Amino acid sequence: MRRFVLALLALFSLTAARADEGMWLLKLMQEQHLTDSLRKAGLQLAPEALYSENAPSLRDVVGRFGGGCTGEVVSPDGLIFTNNHCGFSFVQAMSDLKHNYLQDGFFAKSRAEELPVPGLTFTFVVRIDDVTARVEALARQKKYDQHTRQSAGVLAGLAEKLLKTSTLAKTPGVSARIVPFFGGNRYYMFFEQRYDDVRLVVNPPQQIAQFGFNQDNWLWPRHNADFAVFRIYADAQGRPARYAKTNVPLRREKWLPISLRGVEQGDYTMIMGFPGRTSRFLTASQVRLRCESINEPINLAGEAELRFMKSLMDSDKAASLKYAGEYMKLGNMVKNFGGMNASVASTRLLDIKAREEAAFREFAARSGRPEYRNIIERIDSLVAAVRDTLHDYNLLRFTYGAQDFHPNTAALSGFILRFAPRVQANWQRLDRGKKQIKAGAEEKKLYREFMTSAHRVALTTDFDYDLRKMKLLAPYWAKHHRLKAQPDFVRDDMNAYFDSLYAQTAFRDTAKINMYMATDYFEAFSEDPVISHWLLFDRLINEVYRPALDRYERKVAELNQIYVRGLCEMYGWTKAPDANSTLRMTYGSVRGYSPRDAVQ
């Protein structure tokens, strides 16, 4: 018997789903003839039950958990399910060695025991509008190129303006964001309502929730309880509100009932959520660039950093809790990038792309559209020119700049990389050799903020950890960077260099920090060894790599927009747009599979 199965999280499933290859935007169901395909696949619901802006639908029960995960409402009282790894960093931040909810788990026996989670939000999509014409009109008026019109700042400004004149302008908790689709050929504005009071209900113990840990990550079938349970709270009128004891569970008119019937071979199944990012419209050369100049250097440094962190975490319970979120985040990225490269090879994706490009060249010749001719070759030329620069840029970020990508770690190098640019940008132009740098009011304000942060860093940074990590990662840059770039970080004795750097910096001396806080001058900081080291890093990033990458991104945005438009025309606009952290749906049917010989 065929049954309709709505699968939003396959928490314990050992089955597989045979799916189509799209992450579909439900707003485009009619335009892309998706409803016919869904019915043929076995969907028994009306299309408006999936997505409707005028009546309750699945849009009302699937939301964005935190900044980018997916959750779903499974009760009329705001109970939500999500993946355990989605709540991982939030539960870590709530834990200490006495109440280690991450390692030991947590179970609220009543609503009174549910724990508020600082910083956690849950967001529902309220409406989606096509604003392509508005974006293009603004771009023509301001003479924006493709890169600029797709930039976050430009789109955020327009979204704010359009929200103010919309019917949702005064709805509590509603914001708007505009997102480019199909390589910048379409733009949609998402009206979203955010709830700020989300509380922890259930978190399985780590050994159960993360069984297999990164070895099983991105692989299926899975044998871990990768789930967590939270609840959304609102004020007495059901409006979004900050945490308050008087808040009540959010009442929802529609929710997902949980079925314990299981599934059978051939059952219809679908997934709704907020997938992060895909890049299915790339050329073969761009796929190769991603593999060789992004994934490979990041994996090289990332795997070394993971080994270093694990050795420390295995021997120290406090360190295990402190770095758990950072370790999971980095491990997830490394496994993803490594798996991506392996999949490109195993699926012979470059051969598939070559055939698609050949078909596109034939389409371009038939179309009579001059902008489509040689577009692939023009993209290939840009890629060839930037390949080594992009490789070294990523290698440098994840060796010398590794801490900057883990902001939850109060590490010295991360602090310098995040904050010092703001100070340097406001320094007056003068001879670096001067002992004192006189500053205006704005510079003095930044300096005070800088010194206050420096004092906090001096008290909280594990300098030995930071030093050991820098010594470990720096040689990877020395050995694997491709371009001869100046300034060069390679030293004859890297260990001695970093020992000297960390021994002499004022950031380790709270007395010096206090003394500097008492003055209005940037006294001596231009000569601090850590500042000097950061300035070398900054020069290499901003004077060598970023200008070349910015030129590439600006030029390739123009060409990608043309190429993706041509591909969509070739396919009759029947392809799903790339994932971009917006609400999507994919569907298929349940079936078993054999991942390797003798396993089914």
PLM segments and residue spans:
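Positively charged n-region of N-terminal signal peptides that target proteins for export
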Residues: 1-4
